Amino acid sequence: MIASAASAPRAICLLGPTASGKTAAALKLAERWPVEIISMDSALVYRGMDIGTAKPSAEEQAIAPHHLIDIIDPLDAYSAAQFANDANALIDAIRARGKLPLIVGGTMLYYKALTQGLSDLPGADPAIRAEIDAEAARDGWPALHAKLALVDPVTAARLHTTDAQRIQRALELYRLTGQPMSALLAREVGANAFQQHDAAAPYLTIALEPSDRLVLHARIAQRFDAMLAGGLLDEVEGLRRRGDLSPTLPSIRCVGYRQAWAYLEGEIDMAALREQGIAATRQLCKRQITWLRSTPERHVVDCLAPDYVDQVARLVQTSLESQSQ
């Protein structure tokens, strides 16, 4: 039990891009302190999606209690707002048990929702989404990315030309409001800057960032190959055989799954599956690092350093000691 849960950080947030060693570091912390782990990963919420998400094994999950893993069916959706609500409730419950909440993951929108709140943007509009999907089917997502660049160059500049989910949302918001998504978000941030800073203060945020991105890219390739060898295609084929899932769902849009689905549909060959899967993972990694670097309250640890786990532990120890004084 933590000596004084009231004096400890509200939660420790261990953030990092794909393949940065978050799980290994979290489990080492669990060996030293009485933590409960809250997953902050938009793919780990899905049941039956284990290999392509690098879900912690049953043995790993037995080391410490894990939360927000395997909580919904791939047919369903899970939002950043839902995560914030669930995580806040879990943090309070874990602290009440005298334990230390440890939030681990790389879904940075979830982190923003938890620590800063979300902007009050309009919800999804099925008619507009259907219209955008029809345009994409006819012209391709790169063409829609070009359309987005004309009306919202700031958002378009940070999106890959085939990032269907985010291009769709940005165009949807523009067509709903007549304003660029970037302007809507900037207005919200400006209006709530003080509250956001104040809300983020109780968290100890540690970011695992690579000193050499090429080394992380090599790790990503090795990891994707290991997923293929470990049965990713069989896992995705099982999802396809259900008959109620499609590549338009957020679950099947997850990196690795949409490429494997396309291969099983006969749309691409094995070489393209591997190439596209690795490229998509690297794009995800790039977005995650960009988000991390815009997080001023973080403590950076080089995830490629041989002693990176020890560095993380020292930051936690220092925080616990300073809070108890």
Curated annotation (Swiss-Prot):
GO molecular function: ATP binding; tRNA dimethylallyltransferase activity
Enzyme class, UniProt record, top EC level: transferase
Annotated disulfide bonds: none
Coiled coil: none
Cofactors: Mg(2+)
Annotated segments matching region Interaction with substrate tRNA: 41-44, 165-169, 253-258, 286-293
Short name of one Pfam family: IPPT
GO biological process: tRNA modification
tRNA processing recorded as keyword: yes
UniProt: substrate binding residues: 18-23
EC code(s) of this entry: 2.5.1.75
Keywords, in A-Z order: ATP-binding, Magnesium, Nucleotide-binding, Transferase, tRNA processing
Marked site: Interaction with substrate tRNA: 107, 129
ATP-binding found in the keyword field: yes
Database matches in PANTHER family: TRNA DIMETHYLALLYLTRANSFERASE
Family indicated by similarity: Belongs to the IPP transferase family.
Self-association and partners: Monomer.
Job description of the protein: Catalyzes the transfer of a dimethylallyl group onto the adenine at position 37 in tRNAs that read codons beginning with uridine, leading to the formation of N6-(dimethylallyl)adenosine (i(6)A).
UniProt cross-references to HAMAP family, sorted A to Z: IPP_trans
UniProt name for this protein: tRNA dimethylallyltransferase
Gene name in the database record: miaA
